[in-house]
């Protein structure tokens, strides 16, 4: 195996483990994003006690005063995602927590990205009405059966997802990793599986030719004002406009963020698993779709162990869910 193939396989393994890779560059010149100016990140926690009651907080905001919601709030300058989560839970509910895993990422473009965690209580005590402030009125454990006026019903599916993961995890524990990035982008783990009755499945990965590091690199797409997920479709339209293919964003393999230097490291890099499928009737599927640009190339994954891991993650859906709302 040559050194380039070895580096690529090592990097792919890191991404599959959720470790992330240093963010190097994007092809175009893009201004850095700034938290609470042109990007907004929200953290929320799903926390259960031993009775599988879920932690809820009573809102103090005028527009939803007295209603109940999961502990959640906006990230602040110089915070990591985990620090923001722990601060919000402490301020709103009075307890300390430790994240177990990211449970879901939701987005409406870079101006609204929400990170939902499954977490556990590690200390402190539930906030009481005597401690009410601008953050919340009180906190308590909800059995999910007793009537409770909710601020919004979107949290019910989040609570269900937390219970499901507690009982039967369907993707590996995923925590944000500390790598600085100046934009909101995706590193695409973009795959194509060619299947033939007379041969084993073959797996292909899209690789970038815009490479200043001289090492094999996965494509990176930047999101501006529109949905983050649309950046994937745009890349496909640009490099395979004549192909009849469907694009399936399977989910997130890793989240990279630093945030220590306001206006310079407020970006996020999502390592996103994508599957392309040929939809043309009678199409030859022994090879991936033809590329109509020199910016990218297909590379076959020939390491059998690595190929098996990737195909398993694709077919099992064993990735952090990613929702565009």
From Swiss-Prot:
Q: Can the keyword Manganese be found in this entry's annotation?
A: yes
> Which GO biological process categories is it annotated with?
dADP catabolic process; dGDP catabolic process; GDP catabolic process
Output the SUPFAM superfamilies linked to this UniProt entry: Nudix
Q: Which cofactor does it need?
A: Mn(2+); Mg(2+)
Q: Where is this motif: Nudix box?
A: 73-94
- The Nudix hydrolase domain is annotated at 38-163
Any Pfam family matching the protein? NUDIX
Q: Which reaction does it catalyse?
A: 8-oxo-dGDP + H2O = 8-oxo-dGMP + phosphate + H(+); 8-oxo-dADP + H2O = 8-oxo-dAMP + phosphate + H(+); 2-oxo-dADP + H2O = 2-oxo-dAMP + phosphate + H(+); 8-oxo-GDP + H2O = 8-oxo-GMP + phosphate + H(+)
InterPro entries the record matches: NUDIX_hydrolase-like_dom_sf, NUDIX_hydrolase_CS, NUDIX_hydrolase_dom, NUDT18_NUDIX
State one molecular function term (GO): 8-oxo-GDP phosphatase activity
- Presence of keyword Hydrolase: yes
Instruction: Write out the entry's keywords from A to Z.
Output: Hydrolase, Magnesium, Manganese, Metal-binding, Nucleotide metabolism
Coiled coil regions, renumbered to chain: none
- EC number(s) reported in the record: 3.6.1.58
- Per UniProt, where does Mg(2+) bind? 55
Q: What does this protein do?
A: Mediates the hydrolysis of oxidized nucleoside diphosphate derivatives. Hydrolyzes 8-oxo-7,8-dihydroguanine (8-oxo-Gua)-containing deoxyribo- and ribonucleoside diphosphates to the monophosphates. Hydrolyzes 8-oxo-dGDP and 8-oxo-GDP with the same efficiencies. Also hydrolyzes 8-OH-dADP and 2-OH-dADP. Exhibited no or minimal hydrolysis activity against 8-oxo-dGTP, 8-oxo-GTP, dGTP, GTP, dGDP and GDP. Probably removes oxidized guanine nucleotides from both the DNA and RNA precursor pools.
- Family to which the UniProt record says this protein belongs: Belongs to the Nudix hydrolase family.
> Could you tell me which PANTHER family the record lists for this protein?
8-OXO-DGDP PHOSPHATASE NUDT18, MUTT/NUDIX HYDROLASE
Its recorded name reads 8-oxo-dGDP phosphatase NUDT18
State the organism's lineage.
Eukaryota, Metazoa, Chordata, Craniata, Vertebrata
């Amino acid at each position: 195996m040559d050194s380039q193939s070895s580096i690529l396989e090592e990097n792919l393994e890191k991404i599959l483990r959720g470790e992330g890779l240093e963010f190097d560059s994007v092809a175009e010149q893009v201004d850095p994003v700034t938290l609470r100016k042109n990007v907004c990140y929200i953290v929320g926690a799903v926390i259960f006690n031993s009775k599988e009651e879920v932690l809820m907080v009573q809102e103090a905001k005028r527009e939803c005063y007295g209603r109940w919601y999961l502990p959640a709030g906006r990230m602040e300058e110089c915070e990591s995602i985990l620090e923001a989560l722990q601060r919000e839970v402490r301020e709103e509910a009075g307890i300390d927590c430790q994240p177990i895993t990211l449970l879901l990422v939701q987005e409406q473009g870079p101006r609204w990205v929400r990170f939902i965690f499954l977490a556990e209580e590690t200390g402190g005590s539930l906030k009481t009405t005597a401690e009410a402030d601008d953050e919340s009125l009180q906190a308590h454990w909800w059995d999910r059966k007793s009537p409770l006026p909710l601020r919004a019903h979107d949290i019910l599916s989040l609570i269900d997802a937390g219970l499901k993961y507690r009982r039967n995890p369907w993707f590996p524990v995923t925590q944000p990793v500390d790598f600085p990035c100046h934009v909101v982008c995706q590193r695409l783990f973009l795959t194509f599986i060619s299947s033939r009755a007379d041969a084993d499945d073959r797996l292909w990965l899209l690789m970038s030719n815009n490479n200043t590091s001289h090492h094999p690199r996965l494509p990176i797409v930047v999101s501006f004002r529109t949905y983050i997920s649309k950046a994937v479709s745009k890349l496909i339209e640009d490099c395979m406009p004549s192909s009849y293919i469907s694009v399936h964003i399977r989910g997130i393999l890793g989240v990279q963020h630093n945030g220590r230097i306001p206006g310079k490291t407020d970006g996020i890099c999502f390592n996103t698993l994508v599957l392309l499928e040929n939809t043309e009737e009678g199409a030859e599927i022994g090879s991936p779709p033809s590329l109509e640009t020199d910016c990218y190339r297909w590379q076959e994954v020939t390491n059998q162990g690595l190929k098996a891991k990737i195909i398993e993650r694709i077919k099992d859906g064993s990735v952090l869910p990613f929702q565009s709302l």
